[in-house]
Amino acid sequence: MGYSFDRASKDVVKKLQGRDLRPVECLSDATKFRLFHILQETPRSGWETEDIPVGFTLLDLLEPNFPVPEPEVSAPKPFIHVQSTDLEANLNVADIARGGVGYVGYGGYNIEVQSTSIPNPKLEILQNRKLLDKLPTFMKFCRMERKNLYVVTEAYEVSKDTMLTGLSSVNLLVKGFFKQLFKVRGKAGRSEKYSIPIPKGSVLAYKKQQLVIENNTCVILPSATKKKMTFPDRPLKLYDLPVTLRYQEEVIETGSWIDDIDPIGTIEEPANLNFMCLQHEVSEQTQLLAELSKDVQEVVFSSFLHMLSDRDVLYDLMKMLELNQLGHMDGPGGKILDELRKDSSTPHDVLKDLNLYLLQALLVLSDTQLCLLAQSVKMGLLPHQVELVKSILQTNFKYSSNTPFTLQPQLLAPLQGEGLAITYELLEECGLKMELNNPRSTWDLEAKMPLSALYGSLSFLQQLQKANSSSKPSLSPGYI
C-alpha cells in the first residue's frame, strides 16, 4: 500500500496519543492548520466531521495593536514506520479459468515533528478582545448558516523536509479466457510507486478550541466541545442537523428501536440504531440523487470518475462548496461548479449538498481506496461491493470489541479473480484483516467509520453508474 500524507498523519496521531488531537488529511492545506488559524467545522454526515481552513487567522479578525502570546515549542520527535501487505490466493474463476490473484504493497515514512502550542493561561491575553468593525464575508456566511468556528491552539509540524515512499501492485496470473482478455501470457495487473515530498513546516496534527462571538467580542472556550454555538444569537434548529442526527431524533422519539435491543453485554447502545440511521441517510440521499435529471447525473458521474485518483482536487472542490465559493476551477471539478451556476430545474442547494455528501464520504477513504474505487466502477463491481459492505456493517455495527465474523458465500460468489482482490483490499484499507483464501475476519471498532464512508461512496457511485448505464465509462490511463 502506498503511504499517503493522510495515512501518515493518522498514524502519527495514534502514536502521539494526545487527547483531542486530529490529523491533517490533505497536504495542500498542511500549512493552513498552524497556530491561530481559523477552522470551520462541517459534519461529514454519518461518519465524522471535517475542519475546513477558512484562510484567515484569529489575529486577522481582532483589533490591531494588542499583545500576542508567545508559543511554546517542543523538541523534535522522530517517527519511523514501515508497513507491508501481501495477499495471495489460487481461485476458481466461474469455471472459465484458474489463476492466482495477489496484492502486494509496502509504504512508510521517517518523520520528525515538533509541537507549537498556546496553553490556556497564555490564551487569556486574547480573551474578550474586540473584533474588527468590518469582518471578512465568510463570517457573515458562517453566522447565517450556523457554522461553528474553531482556532488552532496546538500544531505538530514537520521539523525538516522528508519523503513518503511506497508501492502498491495488483497482479493476476491469467489463463484461458483471461489470457485473451488481457492479451498477455503470464501475469497481468497494475503497480504504482509513490514518492511524496513533505516540506518542513507542514502540519500533520492539531488541536482546536471553539470560538464564541457575541457583542463584537471573541471568547476562546477551554476545549473543542460544543457547549455553545459560535454565534449564540442564531440558535440551532432541528432542521439544521445532519440527516443522520435528525433521523436518530425521530427514532428515539418514537421508540421504534425498543424491540431490537440485544442482551446486555453485546452492545453499548440500542442494537442497530446507528446503522439504521446510516442506512436511512444513505437511502434518502441516494433517492435524491436518482431524482436529478439524467444529464446532471452524467456530469456528476464523469466528473467524479476523473477526480477519484486526485485527493487534492476532491478536497479543493469540497472546500469551495463548503465555503459557498462557486468561482473558477479547472478540470472536472469545474464542470460540477458550472452545473451549480446554471439556472436549472434542480435546486441549487440540493445539488450542492449531494456533491458534498459524496465528497465528504470519499475523503474519509485512503488514496489507495480512491484508485480502487475507480477500477471497481470500470469493472462493474459496485452492486456486489455495496451488498458485501452493507452485510459487514449490519452484522457488526453494534460491537465495540474485536468480534470474529464470516463473509457470506453468496455475496463473495460474484467477486472472483481481480475483482475479489480489489474488494478485499478496499476492506483491508478500512482496517479489517483479510486473506483471499479465507472468508473469515475480525471486526475492529476503528474500521466502523471508514467502512461507513465506503458504504456511502459505493452507494452513490452505484446510483450514478446506473443512471449512466447506457454509455460505458471511459477512463483515461492518467486517472487510474
UniProtKB/Swiss-Prot annotation:
Detail the disulphide connectivity of this chain as listed in its UniProt entry. none
One GO biological process this protein is involved in is: programmed cell death
**A GO CC term attached to the entry:** cytosol
Region labeled Triggers pyroptosis — which residues? 1-226
Free-text description of this protein's post-translational modifications in UniProt: Cleavage by CASP8 relieves autoinhibition by releasing the N-terminal moiety (Gasdermin-C4, N-terminal) that initiates pyroptosis.
Domain of life according to the entry: Eukaryota
Write one Pfam family the protein is assigned to. Answer: Gasdermin
Sorted alphabetically, which keywords does the UniProt record give?
Answer: Cell membrane, Cytoplasm, Lipoprotein, Membrane, Necrosis, Palmitate, Transmembrane, Transmembrane beta strand
Q: Which InterPro entries match?
A: Gasdermin (IPR007677), Gasdermin_pore (IPR040460), Gasdermin_PUB (IPR041263)
- The annotated site for Cleavage falls at D233, R234
| Domain comment as written in the entry | Intramolecular interactions between N- and C-terminal domains are important for autoinhibition in the absence of activation signal. The intrinsic pyroptosis-inducing activity is carried by the N-terminal domain.
Protein family: Belongs to the gasdermin family.
Quote the protein name from its UniProt record: Gasdermin-C4
Q: What is the lineage of its organism?
A: Eukaryota, Metazoa, Chordata, Craniata, Vertebrata
